[in-house]
Amino acid sequence: MCGIAGYSFSLESTVDRTVAARALLAGIAERGADSVGFAYRGDDSKVTVHKQRTGASEFLDRIDVPQTATQLLVHVRDHTKGHPRVRAINHPIRHGAVVGIHNGTIANDDELFAAHGIARAEPGMTVDSELIFALAERFRGRTAYALERL
């Protein structure tokens, strides 16, 4: 399975964003060796995503989060569906304007993509987690409805 962590700080917080991100990653590192990634939202509301096909220890010193970041997601992955050599499959996953991380398995994701007429965000995407974010994108503003589709 995977490891997930995150934070949400006000702009006024003096917590060092990079130190916090590295501490979170170190805390979940043993949960996934196939890939690692993080996403943060800056004060301009733009979401920046970084990910790579390595374990957390090879990535730890590369994390650099600006002090203006208010939210962060960190993910380490042991793949179950979708091989980490396809960069888009590694988390965080972006589908349209939605960025997220997930720990678990969705057995019927291919059927649900087809049933809702939703295309994968990128060629070669096969990871089941993308379905959650695709439904959230499709049914924006109707979260309960989107989750019921799962």
What are these regions (language model features)?
Residues M1-L150:
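Conserved short alpha-helical segments that host acidic/polar catalytic motifs at enzyme active sites
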